[in-house]
């Protein structure tokens, strides 16, 4: 036995593992063109077009507005449904506003108590040093 055969014990096993970094040759049955010229190149960046800018503006500016409108109308609808069905004593107006009288849809008049203040007494209170 020679010194080269003793130093490499894996050569006797008969297992050959090819390296990933090995340069492979093209098979003979392949077309004469090189693979890089026959397949299109992968484009990683494309400059923005007017259509892509418009599309992204609609997505980022208009859709949140529509989403907020839908959420608002959904909340109004749910509150109205709860009021009309009488779920858990839902009231449209709080108890503190019961003394008001409605004059139109969503408009109420509340009487404010007014006390008569004598102008001279009022000025005396404002200008007193006590």
From Swiss-Prot:
Signal peptide: none annotated. InterPro entries: OMP_MIM1/TOM13_mt (IPR013262). GO terms for cellular component: mitochondrial outer membrane. The keyword RNA-binding does not apply. GO terms for biological process: mitochondrial outer membrane translocase complex assembly; protein insertion into mitochondrial outer membrane. It is found in: Mitochondrion outer membrane. Keywords: Membrane, Mitochondrion, Mitochondrion outer membrane, Protein transport, Transport. It holds the Pfam family TOM13. It comes from the Eukaryota. Residues 25-41 have a biased composition (Low complexity). Its main location: mitochondrion. Residues 1-41 are annotated as: Disordered. Residues 15-24 have a biased composition (Polar residues). Belongs to the MIM1 family. Required for the assembly of the TOM (translocase of outer membrane) receptor complex, which is responsible for the recognition and translocation of cytosolically synthesized mitochondrial preproteins. This is Mitochondrial import protein 1.
């Amino acid at each position: 036995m020679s010194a080269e055969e003793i130093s490499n014990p894996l050569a006797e096993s008969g297992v050959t593992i090819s390296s990933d970094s090995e340069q492979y040759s093209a098979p003979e049955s392949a077309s004469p063109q090189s693979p890089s010229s026959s397949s299109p190149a992968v484009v990683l960046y494309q400059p923005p077009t007017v259509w892509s800018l418009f599309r992204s503006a609609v997505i980022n500016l208009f859709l949140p507005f529509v989403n907020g409108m839908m959420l608002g109308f959904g909340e109004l609808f749910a509150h109205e449904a709860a009021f009309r069905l009488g779920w858990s004593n839902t009231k449209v107006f709080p108890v503190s506003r019961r003394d008001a009288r409605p004059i139109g849809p969503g408009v109420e008049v509340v009487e404010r108590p007014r006390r008569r203040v004598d102008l001279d007494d009022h000025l005396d209170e404002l200008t007193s040093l006590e």
